[in-house]
Each structure stands twice: as C-alpha cells, then as structure tokens.
Amino acid sequence: MSQLHARDYEPNRSGTLDGVRILDLSRLFAGNVLTQILGDFGADVIKVEPPEGDTLRAWKTEGIETHWKVYSRNKKSLCLSLRDPRAIDIIRKLVPSTQIFIESFRPGVLEKMGLSPDALLALNPSLVIIRISGWGQDGPYAQRPGFGTVIEGVSGFAAINGFADREPVLPPMYLADGVAGIYGASAAMIALREVEMKGGRGQIVDLPLLDPLFAILSPQAANYRLTGKVKPRTGSRSTNSAPRNAYRCSDGHYVSLSGSIQKMAERLFRAIGRPELVDDPRFRTNSDRLRHADELDAIIGEFIGARTQDQNVAFFEQAEVTIGPIYDTPQIMADPHVITRELIADYPDPDMGQLPMHHVVPRLSQTPGAIRTPAPALGQHNRELLNEIGIGDDGYAALREANVICEAPNKAAPAKRQSSL
C-alpha cells in the first residue's frame, strides 16, 4: 500500500500566471517540461496536438501514458491537423489572445506553414515566440535532426560521463530536453517581463537543446585552454576534490560521500578511526588526495563495505560527514522526507487509480503553484476553444467531418477519489 499522501486536483486554485495564455505547438519533452512548469503556476496552456496526439503520449509503460500524465497536467488539448489551411486559420485566430507561442519544428517549417514570427507578431505585437530546436535557428547544423541523444554527445556531456576504460555514457533519460525546458521557462518569464516593462515589445526566443546543456557542464573550454588537457571520465569521482565517490555497502546498496573541503576530509578520517591519515603525506591536502584517490577509496570503501546502507548513513550523519543513500525509486517513494514534504503525492487517475506525481517546483511562500487538473484527453478542449473564436456546433461538425479537428473517441473522466469513511 502506498505511503504517499493522497491529494486531489484543485481546479479552482488561482496562480501568479493567471491570464497568461500559452499556445504550445511543440512536441516531446522540452516543450512539455517548459509548459508544465508555467502551467503549475496558473498559465492557461493550450497544447496543440496532431491527430495521432503529441509524441509524448507514445512513451507508455504497461500501455499507460505515464509521461503524458505527469508532464501535461494543468493543460488543455486542442487537436488540429496543421496540414490543413483551416487549422492554420484557427491558430491565427487564437494568437491575439496569446502571450507565449511555443514550437519545436525544424527551422523554417513554421514559416512554410504561414506562421512565421513576422506573421505572428503582426497579429500580436506583444507575443513571446519560443522556438525549440536541436541546434538553433541558424548555423551550419540548423537543419540537422536535433534529438537529445545527439545533443548529449555533441555538448561534451557523454565524453565526461562514465569510466576512463569504458565508452562514453549517455544519460539514461532526456537530460538535454529537460535542461532546455527549464531554461525555456526562465526565458519565457524574462521575455514576458520585457513586454510588461518596456511598452509591449514581443520577441523571439531561440532555444536550442545544445546551448543550455553545454552551459551547465562546468567551465570546460576555459579549463582546456589553461591546461591543454581534456577532462577525463572518472566514474563517480571528481576531478576537483577527493574523497568523492559512490561506495558499496554490505547489503548491496550504495552511499554517496563527499569530503570536498579540508575540514570535512579530516572529520571523515577521525570518524572512521584513522586520525593518522590527517597528516599522512598521501592525504594531507586535497591535491595529495586526488593523486592517491585509489588508496583513499580503498580505505573508505573497506569501512563502508562492512556496514549496511542505513548503518552508514546513521554513523556518518552522527559524525557530521557529508553522506547520503543512493536510492532507487521504491526507496524514494518510502523516504519519510519525501513523504512529509510531498515531493511525490498520489493523485486520482482513471487508469492507475492513483498516479504518483512530483510536487510543483519551485515552492513559493506567497504564491505557490498547484496541480489543478489532470492531463487532458486528446482534443478534450476543442469545443471550448473553438467556441471562443466564434466556431459553433455547425462549424465544429463540419471541421470534424473534414478531419481538420480531431478528438479521442472516448474521453474518460478523471477518477473520483474514494471516501475513506
């Protein structure tokens, strides 16, 4: 039985971004992360989906759209066949009431659709246009496919990830997309602030996957210029400080430990009953410890390997040494800190009964976000949005018949929470 707190959706909650409408034509992960963040704080996110649905829907587990459910909460779904000029006309009619427009087509495709930035800004001069791509809107690689896997290689991430005697390691998740989505949410707010402060000037945000990921990977270029050396793959070790590693415990679990400052390293040596290591020439300074990392890890690993994960965490926390358990998902979901702060909570779901989802991030004291609505069914909000631009029942039926608009055949209602009484 789940230990997570049971929460319900809060459809009547307001947010800081109430009144900010986002028209999101992007696909897959980066755009969905971006709009999930802003939607959590009240933005009116209209997810424009093709007849087959956003490609994120295809990432299923046991036949269930878990990615879509988590990252498309607080959104509306408008399903349009954008190959039809009538669908493009619908987009144009929605643009004047929109503050942020997002797309992730290959550079030039939006222009071919008749929705160039100039055309959009003519309809709404205050519009913020976010263009997500792999490589950016210009440059030699602009027309290359821009999947995150490729970007994670070119950015330098894979080259520094893994072990020296093994192949470079790509991340086991969509890191480039996720980082771009977070940067994109920041960019959207910066550009929107410009609109508010300087008299309504909209602008274009060029958001490739490559630039944000490279930006967080340490000062690689500066370090290379200074040393002429490429940062090696060091597994869980650091090239900046030692000790720092993942250590195996007696129960097969692992802990992560860092003695990155001198006082912490000395405290660690005393805690494991080896005070003489403080003055050992191999370990006296951080530079010494880096040169003798194998010997240092062997000493620490022997101590940790004789104890379980829980024993190690309790021991080193008592000694005020920086350590933490390396969790798998079941451990995360059972952790008292995670449960108490509701980092994850259970929400009602028609397919799973209860859907564990991450909390709104970040947490604001005066204007916290909220999970107001579950992820929508395909085309769930077609009628509402088309009615807004003057398309009534007859017009809707004609567009539906012509396959300009589409909807899920059976849109399930959100699950009702069962009473505990």
Q: Where is each model-derived feature located?
A:
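A short glycine-threonine-serine/GTX helix/turn-capping micro-motif
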Residues: 169-179, 200-204, 233-238, 242-244, ...
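Short Gly/Pro-enriched turn/cap motifs at secondary-structure boundaries
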Residues: 68, 234-239, 245-246, 352-355, ...
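Glycine-rich beta-alpha junction loops
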Residues: 52, 135-136, 209-214, 251-253, ...
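Aromatic-enriched alpha-helical interface/lid elements that frame and gate functional surfaces
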Residues: 243-319, 323
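Beta-strand segments within the central parallel beta-sheet cores of soluble alpha/beta enzyme folds
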Residues: 201-210, 315, 397-400
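Oxidoreductase and adenylate-handling cofactor-binding alpha/beta cores
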Residues: 181-202, 215-227, 269-275
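A glycine-rich dinucleotide-binding beta-alpha-beta segment and adjacent secondary-structure elements
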Residues: 318-372
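N-terminal helix-loop segment corresponding to the beta1-alpha1 unit
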Residues: 1-198, 233, 377, 383-421
